[in-house]
């Protein structure tokens, strides 16, 4: 597995924050690094595999990667990211208690993927632009300015993420997407889902397509297929059992959609035929 080193991304040893845009981000094999990373998903879609667990990502998602994590990107479609790299929180000169603004692991669960609305995404872009404009200088005012902007970024992300809740349309759609991640295997009525999240059916279709580039059913199918592929690689369950457990009522239809999505049949994935691409 590749290890990325801070010396290749930070302009100086003393600089605590660096910006690394990926416009676009193609498929990238599993790797880890000796720094932390906040991934801002600008637009497009892809699959982010963090510590072996797949997540479908799209515009407005924020991913928090620790220096102890391993991750990779695959099956990307016009995926544009901005990576905010930062050193260990104890390396900051003026900021104390920084960890309180970051996701915290609790009972073995690490809430690594957040969602923000489009207004917050624009705020975040502006803060990142200002961070990019700060020089690599180490005089007190420059260091303080850099760290203040980074703290403002963390505050904006936390305040406007799903953790804090909101009632606008963007927030309701983000809650819907998070709900689908947890309930992908259930039979879905889009009319009932729209009612559940106080959206009109037309708004649901339009907004989900705008956020993910996919129709609602296509997005749900991709979620199911990604989860199924994970089980094919990491469990001994039969293909038929996996198809049913991921929400497909017909294993033949599942196999057809699977090959169309990934270019391999479920049995080929089970046999590790795609291993060279992982």
From Swiss-Prot:
What parts of the sequence cross the membrane? none
Its subunit composition reads:
Binds DNA as a dimer.
Q: Does the keyword Membrane apply?
A: no
Site described as Interaction with sigma-70, located at 250
Sorted alphabetically, the Gene Ontology BP terms of this entry are: positive regulation of DNA-templated transcription; rhamnose metabolic process
UniProt name for this protein: HTH-type transcriptional activator RhaS
Task: Show the PROSITE patterns listed in the entry.
Answer: HTH_ARAC_FAMILY_2
Gene name linked to the record:
rhaS
CDD domains recorded: cupin_RhaR_RhaS-like_N
């Amino acid at each position: 597995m590749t290890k990325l080193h801070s010396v290749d991304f930070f302009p100086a040893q003393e600089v605590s924050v660096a910006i690394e845009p990926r416009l676009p981000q193609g498929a990238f094999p599993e790797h880890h690094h000796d720094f932390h990373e906040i991934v801002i998903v600008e637009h497009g879609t892809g699959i982010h595999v963090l510590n072996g667990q797949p997540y479908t990502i799209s515009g407005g998602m924020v991913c928090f990667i620790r220096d102890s994590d391993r991750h990779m990107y695959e099956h990307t479609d016009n995926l544009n990211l901005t990576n905010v790299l930062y050193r260990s929180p104890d390396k900051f000169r003026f900021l104390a208690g920084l960890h309180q603004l970051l996701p915290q692991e609790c009972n073995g669960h690490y809430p690594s993927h957040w969602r923000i609305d489009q207004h917050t995404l624009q705020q975040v872009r502006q803060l990142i632009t200002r961070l990019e404009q700060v020089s690599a200088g180490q005089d007190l005012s420059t260091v303080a300015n850099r760290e203040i902007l980074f703290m403002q970024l963390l505050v904006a992300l936390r305040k406007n993420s799903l953790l804090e809740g909101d009632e606008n349309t963007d927030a309701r759609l983000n809650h819907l997407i998070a709900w689908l991640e947890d309930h992908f295997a259930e039979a879905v009525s889009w009319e009932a889902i729209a009612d559940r999240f106080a959206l009109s059916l037309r708004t649901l279709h339009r907004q989900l397509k705008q956020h993910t580039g996919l129709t609602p059913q296509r997005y749900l199918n991709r979620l199911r297929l990604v989860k199924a592929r994970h089980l094919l690689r990491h469990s001994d369950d039969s293909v038929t059992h996996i198809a049913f457990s991921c929400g497909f009522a017909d294993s033949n239809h599942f196999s057809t959609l699977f090959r169309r999505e990934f270019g391999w049949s479920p049995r080929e994935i089970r046999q590790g035929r795609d291993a060279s691409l992982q």
